[in-house]
A protein has these predicted regions:
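Catalytic cores of eukaryotic secretory-pathway lumenal/extracellular enzymes that build
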Residues: 497, 501-503
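A conserved nucleotide-sugar
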Residues: 298-300, 456-489, 494
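Alpha-helical solenoid repeat scaffolds of the TPR/TPR-like class and their adjacent stem/linker regions
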Residues: 1-435, 443, 449, 453, ...
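Glycine- and acidic
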Residues: 272-276, 436-442, 464-470, 498
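Short alpha-helix at the nucleotide-sugar/activated-sugar donor binding site of glycosyltransferases
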Residues: 535-536, 559
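Aromatic "clamp/platform" in nucleotide-sugar-dependent glycosyltransferases that forms part
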Residues: 524
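Short acidic/histidine- and often glycine-rich active-site loop of Leloir-type glycosyltransferases
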Residues: 551-562
């Protein structure tokens, strides 16, 4: 932490200040607090001490106390630029972005060569989704301090967010060059490489981050999530990497096991849901309708929101929960204390190793039963009791892929929430175009070389057919050029491909299916969300039967739609089915007219049916826990 170079008789000596800062930087917070308390009795009007006191509270995540002390420092010394900057940081952590920006500007007005304040201002505008403002201030930070690694890193993140991937790459690499021991920069570069479909290179960067910080949970999660994209992955390797996460990121400070107090036969079970996806996100689409139905049953639902989304879908969630805890700014042990205080019976991890997860919370075992739902495979955490499976997602011969015990629902692992607005299904595109349009509405990272080869065979086998690929990644000219070049290697000309970027609304996204005759499911990391959206829009999906959790979702959906003939067992069968179905325009037209209604009545969309099975499962888990606990008591 920086402090003002100026001091007067109201401030401690440089040696005294240095000693306190060394304690703070060594994370010896209790010792630092004692030293500050001692010094502040001697220097009651020290702006520097109150600024440091604020930093101490900020390190303890006591942001309101931090703010009070920064304000005291400013009251004593209204020209204290660093205190204004620190006040802005605390306000930004509380999502008071306009107030934070005001403080950063005050700091800059007092000290116009203040790179940290410019950098923080850029981050605040990034949080406000104003990238042009962010670019301006990150650039200003670098003009003042050309070797400012963090500003380069932030530019890398900004450019990645707006699909300017070449510039993102350059800035991340510059940050690493300037600060080669910062694990966050390698993690961010790995995330970018995953977006670009460079899975092996991404793995290298995630491992570099982990080597620097062996308990770096975010890099571990990104590494494990990245493995989902790799074709022919050794399942034992995935399991071993997940187990490393479970062991190396475990920093338990309190044992809750002996402290549980619960009724053996409660009238309602308290269910805690931990997720960053309560909003316009695939995780939100797969939870909303189920939560609506569970609320009607004998459960109290409590949310632990790891990221409060602000979109047109997020307002549907809060009314479903008895309590809503925003945990994004809370430390793991603080969240765990809240979970224990709430008396949760069953704690549900509802997103897996995707972005902004809080899986380490589950290592504390703050609830009697913990389970994984909506993940892409094992979480690797021994303290999680169960992973929710189904006959097709978790076949018995794959149980050894998981750390958790598998608890199978009878039909499907998750239920999709249809949009609450109508999108008209138009007639079959082929009947208008006189050629077949295949499509995949998925991240470009899911389009691997095996798929490109397979989809090229399909296009080569069906004259005049086209392939539509849509995702915000295709707003990047680099990804467009790379995609065209990859297909050209298989003699597929550019005019056979239709590449479309980001949609402004979800309705606009769904309307793209009116341009697709047959959807092609990617593999091994299959579509799931795009498959459900496609069938709701009347578009059937050819999928490949796989050999691991993420590689089973298409099979599971099509099985529950009674569309068994659309599941291929081999690459050759995948191609032959595409050829067969594309030649039967009458069948495709019939499917288009009936598939939405069929889907809505199937387990894929039938939320009351799903919630019934889910409810039985939860109560059976509780009774099993009570029975086991009673036996232990008798021993």
């Amino acid at each position: 932490m920086k402090i003002s170079n100026k001091k007067d008789q109201n401030d401690p000596t440089k040696e005294e200040i240095k000693f306190i800062l060394e304690l703070l930087n060594s994370n010896k917070l209790n010792e630092a607090r004692k030293e500050i308390d001692k010094q502040i009795t001697k220097y009651v009007n020290s702006s520097i001490l109150f600024n440091i006191f604020g930093a101490l509270f900020a390190a303890q995540n006591q942001l309101n106390n931090a703010i009070k002390n920064y304000q005291k420092a400013i009251k004593i010394n209204p020209s204290y630029a660093q205190a204004y900057n620190n006040l802005g940081v605390a306000l930004q952590k509380l999502n008071k972005l306009d107030d934070a920006i005001l403080q950063y500007n005050k700091a800059i007005n007092l000290k116009n060569d203040f790179p940290e304040a410019y950098n923080n201002l850029g981050n605040a505008y990034l949080d406000l989704n104003k990238p042009e403002n962010s670019i301006e201030y990150f650039t200003k930070a670098l003009s003042v301090k050309p070797d400012f690694a963090d500003a380069y890193n932030n530019l890398g993140t900004l450019f990645s967010d707006v699909a300017r991937f070449d510039e993102s790459m350059l800035n991340y690499k510059k940050a690493i060059e300037l600060s080669p021991n910062n694990e966050k920069y390698y993690n961010n570069l790995g995330t970018l490489l995953n977006t670009l479909g460079k899975y092996d290179e991404a793995t290298t960067e995630f491992n570099r981050a982990i080597k620097i910080k062996p308990d770096y949970a975010k890099a571990y999660s990104n590494h494990i999530f990245n493995l989902n994209y790799i074709t022919n992955l050794d399942k034992n390797f995935y399991l071993s990497e997940a187990k490393k996460f479970g062991l190396n990121c475990k920093t338990i400070k309190k044992d809750f096991l002996a402290q549980y107090q619960y009724e053996k036969e409660p009238k309602k079970l308290k269910l805690g849901f931990v997720s960053s996806d309560f909003g316009n996100h695939p995780g939100g689409f797969f939870t909303l309708s189920a939560l609506r139905e569970l609320k009607k049953k004998n459960f109290d639902l409590i949310a632990y929101s790891a990221y409060d989304r602000k979109d047109d879908f997020s307002p549907h969630f809060r009314p479903l929960f008895l309590k809503w805890h925003s945990i994004e700014k809370m430390k793991d042990d603080e969240v765990v204390e809240q979970i224990f205080k709430d008396g949760i019976h069953i704690l549900i991890e509802a997103q897996g190793h995707s972005a902004k997860n809080r899986i380490p919370i589950f290592m504390y075992k703050a609830a009697p039963i913990q389970l994984s739902w909506l993940s892409t495979g094992t979480l690797g955490v021994a303290e999680i009791d169960y992973l929710i499976g189904s006959p097709h997602m978790t076949p018995q011969d794959e149980e050894n892929h998981f750390v958790e015990k598998i608890w199978r629902l009878p039909e499907i692992t998750q239920c999709f929430t249809p949009p609450d607005f109508d999108v008209k299904i138009k007639s079959l595109p082929a009947s208008r175009n006189h050629f077949i349009t295949f499509g995949s509405v998925n991240k470009s990272a899911k389009v691997n070389d095996d798929e490109v080869a397979l989809w090229s065979k399909i296009l080569s086998s069906i004259p005049n057919s086209k392939l539509l690929l849509k995702n915000r990644d295709f707003d990047s000219q680099k990804i467009v050029e790379n995609t065209l070049a990859r297909f050209e290697k298989h003699k597929i000309k550019n005019h056979r491909l239709i590449l479309k970027g980001k949609s402004q609304t979800r309705k606009e996204l769904l309307e793209i299916y009116n341009e697709i005759d047959i959807a092609l499911d990617p593999f091994p990391f299959q579509g799931h969300t795009s498959t459900c959206e496609g069938v709701w829009m009347g578009v059937p999906v050819i999928t490949l039967k796989g050999d691991r959790f993420v590689f089973h979702s298409g099979e599971s959906i099509n099985t529950n739609l009674n569309m068994h003939d659309w599941i291929a067992k081999t690459y050759e069968e995948y191609v032959s089915k595409a050829i067969k179905f594309s030649s039967d325009i009458d069948l495709l037209s019939k499917i288009r007219k009936t598939l939405r209604e069929t889907a809505l009545q199937s387990p894929v969309f039938d939320s009351p049916r799903f919630a019934k099975h889910f409810s039985v499962m939860l109560w059976d888990m509780w009774r099993k826990f009570i029975k086991k606990s009673t036996k232990l008591e008798q021993l």
